[in-house]
């Protein structure tokens, strides 16, 4: 995490086990990752300081565009003007920081709650909600509007397999619970739509949004989104689809061979027996999916397995 300078509040991808790259993003400094340790540790002071530092991460978007290498709409950042960021990895990281500050009743909790409320309202007002993919954020008024690619809010469609695997489901579900009856109108429905349609059929996606989402991945990870939708809508059909995504799509399979491979020579400093087929991404997303699926739709598991 960068603690000073123009990139303060952003994280750098990799940079621990091997060389870093030019990805400087909020998804890497995501406060949600630190939240659980903070509480389990009884309020670790250093983590508390870091959570406070990350409250101003929204200001960095006027200096550095995290999507600069793949952006096609011509937008470039400028300090003190509206800034573009994604509704997945970027907004979820900013929202997590604001949510934690509100939750902790920190010195800026009212500001944080207002930023959260305003941006939630902005997402709800987008024609396609989270499916829009990104938006323009005003760091002065703390409001969120349509993205540069769709200034008239006609209904942009931009879905990434990464949007919901960096804390977004956890942050959104907590925010909805915290706001309760005060949640801005339309936001829960916008989230339910994303949860349902991410792995709906191409025909369903096209009927709802005019186009399909194309080829996606991380369906096991996203099974927890379908599980959330099934729970909220009390829909057993969606629940069974969620379990199918969990057991029979990608990620860790129940019948996978749990073998190790001996690695030595110039590949490692010390010889080691390694599960080379096991990826940390799969393990992390599998764990989250297990926890959330069982919390939301455990009553339908026997029906799926039978």
Please state what every model-predicted region is.
Residues 1-305:
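Catalytic cores of extracellular degradative/oxidative enzymes
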């Amino acid at each position: 995490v960068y603690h000073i300078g123009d990139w303060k509040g952003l994280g750098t991808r990799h940079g621990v086990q091997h060389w870093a790259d030019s990805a400087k993003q909020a998804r890497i400094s995501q406060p949600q990752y630190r939240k659980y340790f903070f509480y389990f540790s009884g309020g670790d002071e250093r983590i508390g300081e870091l959570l406070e530092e990350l409250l101003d991460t929204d200001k960095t978007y006027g200096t550095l565009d995290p999507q600069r290498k793949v952006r096609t709409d011509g937008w470039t950042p400028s300090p003190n003007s509206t800034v573009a960021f994604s509704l997945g990895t970027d907004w979820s990281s900013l929202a997590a920081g604001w949510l934690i500050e509100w939750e902790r009743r920190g010195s800026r909790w009212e500001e944080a709650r207002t930023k959260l409320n305003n941006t939630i309202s902005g997402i709800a007002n987008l024609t396609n909600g989270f499916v829009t993919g990104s938006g323009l954020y005003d760091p002065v008024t703390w409001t969120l509007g349509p993205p540069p690619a769709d200034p008239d809010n006609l209904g942009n469609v931009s879905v990434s397999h990464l949007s919901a695997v960096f804390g977004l489901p956890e942050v959104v579900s907590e925010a909805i619970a915290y706001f309760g009856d005060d949640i801005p109108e339309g936001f829960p429905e916008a989230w339910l739509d994303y949860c349902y349609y991410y792995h709906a059929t191409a025909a369903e996606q096209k009927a709802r949004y005019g186009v399909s989402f194309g080829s996606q991945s991380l369906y096991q990870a996203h099974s927890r989104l379908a599980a959330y939708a099934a729970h909220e809508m009390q829909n057993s059909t969606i629940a069974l689809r969620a379990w199918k995504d969990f057991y029979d799509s990608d990620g860790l399979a129940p019948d996978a061979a749990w073998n190790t491979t001996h690695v030595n020579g110039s590949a490692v400093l010390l010889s080691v027996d390694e599960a080379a087929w096991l990826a940390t991404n799969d393990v992390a997303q599998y764990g989250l999916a297990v926890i959330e699926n069982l919390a939301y739709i455990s009553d339908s598991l026997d029906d799926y397995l039978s």
